[in-house]
């Protein structure tokens, strides 16, 4: 196809108003992209100056997307770009990247990045030569542009992956330095010079970010670079051409150059500013840097900051970077000594004014309060903010040099409070008071710990903070709420002051100004956490929740959801009357958050975080009503659309949170509805396609489906859940590219089926064992090998003759027994077990081995029985001891935490299983809360080889029918049966035992009698309770 025709198709695909024509053009492009030289022809359209710019732009987007998808195919995918086409593209893109308009250069840069990251140096070794040659030509922008992309590839690479950048630095930096030097000495430099300098700085930054390349350790070479950096940093920017608009001015090339130089100097100071942190090889260089440059940079920074003191301009990001440098200097004696003479001016005339409410804040407050709120709670904004850097400077100053500075600064704040109180209403310094309150809130940790301030905090709040809740200045009402929240947990001598602050904050939720309402909600979280008497809040809880959801409709912020979580935690079951409404509102808020995709990355990020917060809050509500199962049926329909949509690729960013909701509903609903069953295929499809990292999370609802909906799991044929489970597990277990640790939930699932569906899934025992044994042969991680062996144990417990017959038919029964007994015997240096460390592991092994022990003489090989018997004796005693240790630890924990509030019941990572004999259908509120914690802490199901046995405690295990089986009773019943049915066999077995094993047998016999008595007692108590209830 000729170029004009292709250009028409590209234009039609992007701009045709006719949908059919647009679809046809897109289809043509999809077909053409697989033809040779397609990519080359698209590139020719992009660089054709005679073509319409909009068509060229459309072609550049198509070009970028195609390269991103196909330049470096994923493993197993076919490479659809011919090597010859790649060579042409690589050569031509270098020529044209500096010639196309900036709007196209952005797309070309993305393409170059993809190609360089994929091909350099292996497939594109000549790239460095091209850069070096073009750095020596008059027009260097293209070479700088390419070198910037090349250097960025290695910016965050670790040592072994950084090797190629060393040659890049060696061969290009001498030329870069020459170019930089020429640019610095241009008279009346243009903006193009600034753009070139900025590019050079960004290249330098990428090359030094993780380590300083060896050529720069040469003092002469390094000094030459530093001289040029300081020259640009110190010299005034040109007055001509500087934009008036503050937003455009901060992005102006000359200010950008200063910003990148400040970046570089901060990085060098962080790396070489402290001799104590240097290795021997770097010590001499670090000393040279400190002597020659650390103080010089400090002096230069102070001069720059002085400009804003006298009304000059400095971009926010540059101020932020300079204050970071000064903050890092406070702890170093030599640097602090240089800073000290300037400290009063710096602290009171530069830093503090930056902390105060200013004209830009007022303009944003008035014109776009939503943006004001977003910026105030945006972590990324904090990284760039002069105000945050000022707060950090003050914090570091009072922390490291508090003796001489803390009293002085607090007195300065107190003086502002006095001036404010003494001034008439029309002359009150509202903005200074705002800065003083910010300072008091910022230093809350220090003030709470230091006398005499600690004793005066309550009085300070009453005199200087509480009155501002009714200030005519909205920003002071907001700041009062924030400061009150910072001090909500101090010990109030007069509880009425706590109550007053709490009710002022609650009133602030109805303020006319949005930022006041938001700050009040966030402060409320601190007050609820600190509140000892919930009667303070109970009467206004409905109003609180109403105001809360009005605010959620206005603002997308994850902290709003955190506040709601705190309310739900604190009130527990009391929240149940509001649970349905809360979930409805949160679901609506969630959809609003994910529908805010408007091309603004900052807004998208805020919306995504807020969406996660909504889902977390929903989970917290579901946990709080876990002892009221009937409510789940009302809430489920509100959440089903979210679950259905977000269990697909659309929900990858919230997949874990959605699985948590699925887990709660499938755990606590009276029955699992057909609508909830419809989510099974979505989870399984995701698991195979992209969600292997979430396998432990998916395990929880799958377990619930199988164990709580066993009948439906076994009988349903459309879809066939049994077949679907096998299809997924067999694919995953056969995939050698998946790590053992990622597959640990797979054998757990097989065990769940065998335990839950005993006698009903005979047809699956052989395939389960086959896939398990195939994976066992190559398994390396010990915890994964244990889980695979436990599938065999579960198969024996499911149907011993069937499972043993399958192993014998496979010809590996002896091999499996040998491996199993060997793993049971393996010990660490400490003497602790290397394998089967958890209670659940031991119990599964005991049940499987006891099932083998119970086989008649003709079915189990005679040489295996003594090994089985001895292994059981050791396992049972170890299991008994572990249960006792866990019970003791739990008792001690209850003694320590008996008075803790409901929130502490969530901290169940180290709690033991509830007991073997508890009927899961008769779980009380306490057990339900533990199960809720179990559903919440998904990752606890993975064993961790890094734990020592001393630190190790069992996972909260998923409930199973084997919880009702007492392994001691099962074993002793099997022993008794053998004594009765085959006395000679039993005598032969016991005669081979040495005194150690006789002792173990005696211990187990005594403990079993104790267990029988306990079981009988529990049974009688349950019968008695049932009689009373009836």
UniProtKB/Swiss-Prot annotation:
GO MF, any single term: small GTPase binding
Q: Where in the cell is it found?
A: Cytoplasm; Nucleus
Annotated stretches, region: Disordered:
886-928, 940-964
| Presence of the UniProt keyword Zinc in the record | no
Major localisation: cytoplasm
| GO CC annotation, single | nucleus
Instruction: Spell out the InterPro entries in the cross-references.
Output: ARM-like, ARM-type_fold, Importin-beta_N, XPO2_central
Q: Which UniProt keywords apply?
A: Acetylation, Cytoplasm, Nucleus, Protein transport, Transport
Where are stretches of biased composition, namely Acidic residues? 890-924, 943-964
- Pfam families the UniProt entry points to: Cse1, IBN_N
Under the heading PROSITE patterns, the entry gives:
IMPORTIN_B_NT
Q: Which GO terms describe its biological process?
A: intracellular protein transport
Give the N-acetylmethionine positions (modified residues).
Answer: 1
- Report the gene knockout effect: No visible phenotype under normal growth conditions.
The residue ranges of the Importin N-terminal domain are: 25-99
- Family label: Belongs to the importin beta family.
Q: What does this protein do?
A: Functions probably in nuclear protein import, either by acting as autonomous nuclear transport receptor or as an adapter-like protein in association with other importin subunits.
Q: Known PANTHER family for this protein?
A: IMPORTIN BETA-LIKE SAD2 HOMOLOG (PTHR10997:SF53), IMPORTIN-7, 8, 11 (PTHR10997)
**What's the name of the protein?**
Importin beta-like SAD2 homolog
Organism for this UniProt entry:
Arabidopsis thaliana (Mouse-ear cress)
